[in-house]
Amino acid sequence: MKLDAKSTIEAGKAILGIELGSTRIKAVLIDQENKPIAQGSHTWENQLVDGLWTYSIEAIWSGLQDCYADLRTNVKNAYGIEIGTLAAIGVSAMMHGYMPFNKKEEILVPFRTWRNTNTGRAAAALSELFVYNIPLRWSISHLYQAILDNESHVNEIDFLTTLAGYVHWQITGEKVLGIGDASGMLPIDPTTHNYSAEMVAKFDKLIAPKEYNWKLEDILPKVLSAGEKAGVLTPEGSKKLDASGHLKAGIPVCPPEGDAGTGMVATNAVKQRTGNVSAGTSSFSMIVLEKELSKPYEMIDMVTTPDGSLVAMVHCNNCTSDLNAWVNLFKEYQELLGIPVDMDEIYSKLYNIALTGDTDCGGLLSYNYISGEPVTGLADGRPLFVRSANDKFNLANFMRTHLYASVGVLKIGNDILFNEEKIKVDRITGHGGLFRTKGVGQRILAAAINSPISVMETAGEGGAWGIALLGSYLVNNEKKQSLADFLDESVFVGDAGIEVSPTPEDVAGFNAYIENYKAGLPIEEAAVKFK
């Protein structure tokens, strides 16, 4: 029998998902049909301490408690009840970074987040040693950089984990990590669903002269796949989440995951030959692979889905910020004329006029580099619009070139996958601000990567919903289905989203544009040098 939201919470059948994002901690309660029934949130910001980006341990727990208290208040206001117990809990967070602890469970240095780029020497050395692309933000890069810098705390390390792994450990007592989050610490072997034994051995040999009193595998969290038991909420853990003391201990907690993995779950993109693209302030694509790539690429990061399939990730620092700045310029012009401003209407009009422009943007070029862009080799960036006297300069082409630029770098990375590695994809789901104006961002992205793009209504629910779904998979998977089948049949049933396919003309036009774009990169380099 289907329970209403109030009865679901009263009966302890609701599932809680919490995600610690870079600017917001969000909690979502879902019902037995995996639909959100209550939410809570807390806003926070990272701090720059001694040149490194961090969040304090105090900020983590006060933020989690405030987020849960907000959820509690919202449940009380909406349904007139307390949350006493739950069917399951899941915790996810931003991936990577560095949280080393000693035997007394004390953090040895402030949490170093994924944003820190002080790990260049370590990442380069490990990429060469492992013959595998090791990004700056990965935990193993942070660990080896601390070793290269002769930091005294390294010998005391008893446990090294991520933010999600830390919170899970503190509320359950279990030193475990979901495979997707673990793949952002150290490369995963897709056959064993564990850390690469070869790379672990190479690392231990590399640091052997230091004579530390630990081996790498001893200090890493145990790797778990979606659906595996990962512990229960302890009495101490319940107090750490719910300062009011109403939440009971003993609730099953699913393996903690990273935000990339929960994003894949929230967009139903964990099956091989599917993918998702997040396009907002920054952008990234995640394509679930059928097999390993033929070789490592510096611009492609390899992670996994929460059930262990390999994923090729292309991450771009810039997406819609420059485009938004131009739209705001048109807003100012409208205000100057004394015309009432409706931002949704301005976006709709400007985005849709772009679709009437030349498919190659009439020769116009835009570089949306508010910051540097590793994929194209620029450490710093300058937003830039360039045209020659003979180019077709009109509003439609102007807006189209800025829309193209918002996914141009993403195209360069994905062209390697589709053209060089011959990767096949059946469905890609788009989510984020670029897709808010119906149909336009979809059509642009479809042309860029020559693939049908779907947009779902639910994609905006985000990672907190994604980790709640993984909690549901832990306790509601009576049929013992794969994660992909569970999502298809119990969550997204009948919701394939609205799909837009690329046209041959748009694809040819974008390909011509991207050749101009790549040829013009020295102009962007000059702008960085002289402006």
Regions found by a protein language model. Give the residues of each.
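N-terminal glycine/serine-rich phosphate-binding loop of ATP-dependent small-molecule kinases
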Residues: 1-110, 124-125, 156, 217, ...
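Conserved beta-strand positions that form and line the central face of beta-propeller blades
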Residues: 41, 113, 499
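Carbohydrate-associated surface elements
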Residues: 116
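Short beta-strand-loop/turn "lid" adjacent to the catalytic site in phosphate-handling enzymes
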Residues: 76-113, 133-135, 168-180, 184-189, ...
